[in-house]
From Swiss-Prot:
Record organism: Helicobacter pylori (strain ATCC 700392 / 26695)
Subunit structure, as described in the record: Monomer.
Zn finger spans (C4-type): 572-598, 616-642, 663-689, 702-725
InterPro entries: Topo_IA (IPR000380), Topo_IA_2 (IPR003601), Topo_IA_AS (IPR023406), Topo_IA_cen (IPR013497), Topo_IA_cen_sub1 (IPR013824), Topo_IA_cen_sub2 (IPR013825), Topo_IA_cen_sub3 (IPR013826), Topo_IA_core_domain (IPR023405)
Site (Interaction with DNA): 32, 139-140, 143, 299, 484
Residues that hold Mg(2+) according to the record: 8, 82
Protein name: DNA topoisomerase 1
Role of this protein: Releases the supercoiling and torsional tension of DNA, which is introduced during the DNA replication and transcription, by transiently cleaving and rejoining one strand of the DNA duplex. Introduces a single-strand break via transesterification at a target site in duplex DNA. The scissile phosphodiester is attacked by the catalytic tyrosine of the enzyme, resulting in the formation of a DNA-(5'-phosphotyrosyl)-enzyme intermediate and the expulsion of a 3'-OH DNA strand. The free DNA strand then undergoes passage around the unbroken strand, thus removing DNA supercoils.
Length: 736
């Protein structure tokens, strides 16, 4: 009977299968096989604690059946999901669905997908780590509770479609704080006195009449001119010359956060793009040695390096660069994060033999660029430090001192691989006490610059330093803030949009802990403690939930609505009120601002406008198109006095059936249809099925609600948008 190995991704399964004989079957779970119910909180909360309602997604039902059948036939079923909390939880859920005792499923882990790594993992299985599973469940429960309860409240007070979250709101607060700094910034004009001496020596005034000048201290132009006039009359000599040797230490190998930062700064990749490419390099690509993973696991906060990899790197350095570039012993790095999972490794090439040049015919251009970045950084991390000589010269007169600084490279060390953009700034050969002639003295004005907005790289750096989130959350958090229209990223700068200010203002006033970086970091520490079996996850949830829910209930009563609706300049035909534009989950519509006293809704131009020609047969009112969760229908605009409704007639000229995309409501075909004012997409089983979309549906499911996605252009950018919940994912331009 074959042994069964269960991994997460099909690409990973395919690569591993190449390393094993016919006695092994490898199948992918394709991510989480079950999750909290999407149509409610999904968690039962009572005096006994927090009990999840896990549901197998319909897209996974057949796959789960297949896994169960294969497991029944297998003599051993190995759980080989990623060795992080998310991977541990996926393995746990798979084992639970198969059935039987958890102990009967050996858990194997590896940090690289190479034949040796897989074979070694099979020799050293362990049990599923329930502490890690509970840490993941606690994170999932916390995120669901905050997202479900707080997002509903925010949406009710501002506008639908907005959300709040445990990590995303803390990150958004950082962006808002930066915007406030920029807005509050007042430029300061200050002056420096810059001297030009003989021998091409340039220096700046650092003290006057025995008083050290602080940076930006000289703000009076008249005073600066007076000092200039006095110092121009003085005689000067070399007061001191100081030379020091300084090392530029080698940078450590990459972990997730630093890889995202460097890829953003040096390659122009977004964090999401970086992780997507890194995932492919980890799971397996074609190489001269066959299909294999060429980098180690890319979601890590560890800087550990395997002993064998260190030896490979040192041998490579000695062979290619010589003994001068090889330190006496291997360099060891440690993460600043005290809860870093040190069992993991830093991100490195799986084989130092696979130089970037050897892969140029195998990898796509963007894959090669990222691999080259990882390869060079790892090799450089094991080289000698670069060595500089720093120089400083002080030129003095009776009333003041000027200072000049320079440096020159003595030994390039790791710069041999990574390069060095800093040019030497050499000072002339001088001797102490020698006189030197002042050729020119200038008073130069400078204006302080406002704080720079965050880039994706710098925001990740701050999130990491504050302990907000973990390596796996940085990229999704920034992407989520973009998709929610809280931020925009232009020319590598992150700026906040109007809705972000409103949300943060509410959270700061009523839910300060959600946007408090210290609270967020402490919660991450609690999750780390759960993973290390130092804390009970049910107790952590209780400690958070009940105070949080008290604030939710208070918020419902105390938070003033900030909903703002655009005026149309038209009057309501029913009550004389003002018609305004509003938004619902189905899009924009025009209604009376006296709602709920007046429920008038004006029919706007839509894809299906048969209502424009139809009057209510009961009262003579206008039949307008409305939407329910079952689709579109006609209703009298005199509701609630008249409650007449009618199904829409099917548009006869259905055209252009979309290949490979089925109706999410009934499974029927979807086709392009036309009305007098435009085209739309509808189900061919109409009127039995009322599915309708203004944008072309595609064969892709929403990650949030698992409804059908559509493709559209939004603000001149291509995007995929959920037809139901309007979750939007922008398609990235090719930066390669």
């Amino acid at each position: 009977m074959k042994h069964l190995i269960i991994v997460e991704s099909p690409a990973k399964a395919k690569t591993i299968k190449n390393f094993l004989d016919k006695n092994y079957e490898v199948i992918a779970s394709k991510g989480h096989v079950r999750d909290l119910s999407k149509f409610a909180l999904g968690i039962k909360i009572d005096e006994t604690g927090f009990t999840p309602n896990y549901v197998v997604d319909k897209d996974h039902k057949e796959l789960v059946k297949q896994i169960i059948e294969l497991s029944k036939k297998a003599s051993i079923t190995y759980i080989a999901t990623d060795e992080d909390r998310e991977g541990e939880a996926i393995g746990y859920h798979v084992a639970c669905l198969i059935g039987g005792k958890l102990e009967s499923y050996p858990r194997i882990v590896f940090h690289e997908i190479t034949q040796n790594a897989i074979l070694n993992a099979l020799k050293t299985p362990r049990k599923i780590d329930m502490s890690k599973v509970n840490a993941q469940q606690a994170r999932r429960f916390l995120d669901r509770i905050v997202g479900f309860k707080l997002s509903s409240l925010i949406a009710s007070k501002i506008t639908k479609g907005l959300s709040a979250g445990r990590v995303q709101s803390a990150a958004l607060k950082l962006v808002i704080d930066k915007e406030r700094e920029i807005k509050a910034f007042k430029p300061l004009t200050y002056f420096t006195l810059d001297a030009y001496f003989e021998s091409h020596l340039e220096a700046q005034l650092i003290s006057y009449k025995g008083n050290k000048l602080k940076a930006q201290e000289l703000i009076d132009e008249k005073k600066a001119q007076e000092i200039k006039n006095e110092l121009e009359k003085e005689s000067y000599a070399i007061s001191s010359i100081v030379k020091k040797s300084k090392k530029s230490p080698t940078p450590p190998p990459f972990m997730t956060s630093t890889l995202q930062q460097s890829a953003s700064s040096l390659l122009g990749f977004s964090p999401t793009k970086t992780m997507s490419i890194a995932q492919k390099l980890y799971e397996g690509v074609a190489t001269p040695q066959g299909v294999m993973g060429v980098i180690t696991y890319m979601r890590t906060d560890s800087l550990n390096i395997a002993k064998e990899a260190l030896e490979e790197a040192r041998n490579k350095i000695l062979k290619d660069y010589g003994k001068d570039y090889l330190p006496p012993k291997a360099k060891v790095y440690s993460s600043k994060n005290k809860n870093a999972q040190e069992a993991h490794e830093a991100i490195r090439p799986t084989s130092i033999i696979l130089e970037p040049n050897a892969l140029k015919d195998y990898l796509k251009p963007e894959e090669l660029r990222l691999y080259t970045l990882i390869y060079k950084r790892f090799l450089a991390s094991q080289m000698q430090d670069a060595l500089f000589e720093s120089q400083s010269v002080v030129v003095a007169c009776e009333k003041g001192e000027f200072k000049a600084s320079g440096r020159k490279l003595l030994f390039d060390g790791y710069y041999k691989i990574l390069g060095n953009d800093d040019k030497d700034k050499l000072l002339p050969n001088l001797k102490e006490n020698d006189p030197i002639k002042l050729e020119k003295l200038e008073s130069n004005a400078h204006v302080t610059e406002p704080p720079a907005r965050y880039s994706e790289a710098s925001l990740i750096k701050v999130l990491e330093s504050l302990g907000i989130g973990r390596p796996s959350t940085y990229a999704p958090t920034i992407s989520l803030l973009q998709n929610r229209d809280y931020i925009k990223v232009e020319k590598k700068q992150i700026s906040a949009l109007e809705s972000a200010f409103k949300v943060i203002e509410i959270l700061e006033k009523h839910f300060e802990e959600i946007v408090d970086s210290k609270f967020s970091a402490s919660l991450e520490e609690e999750l780390d403690n759960i993973a290390q079996n130092k804390a009970d996850y049910q107790q952590v949830l209780k400690d958070f939930y009940y105070p949080f829910m008290d604030k939710i209930e208070a918020g419902k009563k105390n938070i003033i609505s900030q909903k703002v609706h655009e005026k149309t300049g038209q009057s309501c035909p029913k009550c004389g009120g003002e018609l305004v534009k509003k938004n619902s989950r189905y899009g924009e519509f025009i209604a009376c601002n006296n709602y709920p006293k007046c429920k008038y809704v004006k029919q706007t131009e839509s894809a299906n406008d048969e209502a424009d020609q139809e009057l209510c047969e009961k009262c003579g009112g206008e039949m307008v198109q409305k939407f329910s969760r079952n689709g579109a229908f006609l209703a009298c605009n005199n509701y609630p006095e008249c409650k007449n409704t009618k199904s829409l007639k099917n548009t006869p000229n259905a055209k252009e059936t979309i290949e490979g995309v089925k109706c999410p409501e009934c499974g029927g075909d979807i086709a392009l249809k036309r009305s007098k004012k435009g085209s739309f997409y509808g189900c061919n089983n109409y009127p039995k099925c009322n599915f309708l979309s203004n944008h072309k549906p595609i064969n892709k499911r929403c990650e949030k609600c698992h409804y059908l996605m559509s493709e559209r252009i939004y603000r001149k950018k291509k995007a995929h948008e959920c037809i139901k919940c309007k979750e939007r994912v922008f398609l990235e331009e090719d930066n390669g």
